[in-house]
């Protein structure tokens, strides 16, 4: 059964501007494992990765029903690629499966998260 679904859309230019200012967004949004992946990428891919993870965590919080805040924070959610390169929610506070899709264009990233409980 679907518990919740969340969708988010983030402009890459917004993330690029924040990163260009030298603000500590990656440390706030990304877990240590995500930061390790982020740091290996060239700048253009860092922007895409950061925007994707930010958007995905926002979408997750919407599916969870709380938004980002006291109940669930950015560090509570971890999204890493599996061996085939598919993003997976590897750590999160919900007690059921979390399904994720991340899609990029030249200017935007769109994410969807579905939280499942029990059998469909």
Curated annotation (Swiss-Prot):
Q: Which GO terms describe its cellular component?
A: cytoplasm
Which GO terms label this protein's molecular function in UniProt?
Answer: holo-[acyl-carrier-protein] synthase activity; magnesium ion binding
Task: Spell out the Gene3D superfamilies in the cross-references.
Answer: 4'-phosphopantetheinyl transferase domain (3.90.470.20)
Catalytic class of the enzyme? transferase
Cofactor list: Mg(2+)
Q: Where does Mg(2+) bind?
A: 8, 58
Q: Which reaction does it catalyse?
A: apo-[ACP] + CoA = holo-[ACP] + adenosine 3',5'-bisphosphate + H(+)
Q: Which family does it belong to?
A: Belongs to the P-Pant transferase superfamily. AcpS family.
**The protein, known as:** Holo-[acyl-carrier-protein] synthase
Q: Which organism is it from?
A: Lactiplantibacillus plantarum (strain ATCC BAA-793 / NCIMB 8826 / WCFS1) (Lactobacillus plantarum)
């Amino acid at each position: 059964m679907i518990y919740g679904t969340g969708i988010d859309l983030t402009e890459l230019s917004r993330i690029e501007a924040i990163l260009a200012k030298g603000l500590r967004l990656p440390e706030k949004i990304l877990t240590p494992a995500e930061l390790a992946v982020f740091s290996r990428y060239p700048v253009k891919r860092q922007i895409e990765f950061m925007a994707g993870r930010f958007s995905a965590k926002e979408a997750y919080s919407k599916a969870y029903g709380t938004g980002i805040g006291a109940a669930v924070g950015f560090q509570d959610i971890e999204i890493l690629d599996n061996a085939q390169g598919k993003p997976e929610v590897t750590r999160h506070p919900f007690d059921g499966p979390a399904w994720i899709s991340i899609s990029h264009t030249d200017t935007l990233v769109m994410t969807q998260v579905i939280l499942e409980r029990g059998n469909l």
